[in-house]
Amino acid sequence: MRKRKFAFAASMLAVSTLVLAACSDVEEGGATTDTGGGGTNAAAQCAGDPITIAVNPWVGAEANAAVAQAVMQNEMGCTVELQEINESGQFPAMASGDVDATLEVWPSGHLKDRRDYIEKAGDVVDGGELGITGNIGWFMPSYLVEENPDLATWEGFKENADAFATAETGDKGRFLGADTTYSIFDEAIIASLGLDLEVVYSGSEAASLAALDKAYNSQEPILMYWWTPQWANAKYDLVEVELPAYNEECGAIAAEDPDAAVGYNCDYAEDVLYKAFSAGLETKDPAAFEFFSNFTWTEEDQNAVALSIQEGTDPAEAAQAWIDENADVVEGWLPAPS
């Protein structure tokens, strides 16, 4: 999950396109090999033009896209391109038609995008719920709360922030942020609550995990931006810090100015994850539109594929292994042949 927004032109400089034709697998050196494709004709077939899925920079989003690509390849004869793109770039890319679909939107960080692109302009459409409820917040290992129960709430950091200090932050406690393109309001929360914490951005999900693993194994203090669902939550015993309850005022701030979020002083909103599509997708490829609309799965499903990818399995192989074990779920996604 998650993002601080940048201007579209700047964010697209960070976009890396992975053109993975759905009938091909990428080998070492960047070469591709034909894997057949063509579909089984048991489902409606794609229209022929490539379908582009946005892949945000966290492994859960990669799992969504890998499974969708594999099913569309094998069952619907589609050509699918996976495009790595920051959260901040995905709505403009769908509006322009450069991206056809994103399969995981965290709404708390996209209130302004929803208003501008879905409700006002109408060049992006809501694709329905993904089937997963997410939660962003402040997390720490449970051993810290066991040692000092005051840390269970934000008020405990009024007196204990210095326990999280590092050489980088001096007298202030370190708050470990993640990728700067995620949905992040922590600087505003810290300022609004008057806490002696400094946000230090890890730069990526992988870097945050490495920092967590190091601290956890040494039983050291760490306070971090984190979220559920996330496969690592089964590995580490984490506790979420209680922040002031989310309210409409915070929602209005996030919708109006998500970059600065000045005055945002509460928890993140609960996120019912949803999908979003280019408004032109239904006309471009009705079968792909119906498939994406039908695509839903559970936190457990996503975590199974994400963990396999994280452990080094090729995403296509991880996706296919899950598909082979969940044929009944996949069948429910397929559009009926016309």
Predicted features by range, described:
Residues 17-22:
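C-terminal motif of bacterial Sec signal peptides marking the signal peptidase cleavage site
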Residues 65, 83-121, 210-213, 231-236:
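Pocket-flanking alpha-helical
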Residues 122-175:
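A conserved helix-loop-strand patch within extracytoplasmic ligand-binding domains
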Residues 93, 100-104, 174-252:
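Ligand-binding pocket segment of bilobal, Venus flytrap-like solute-binding proteins
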Residues 24-27:
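Bacterial signal peptide processing site
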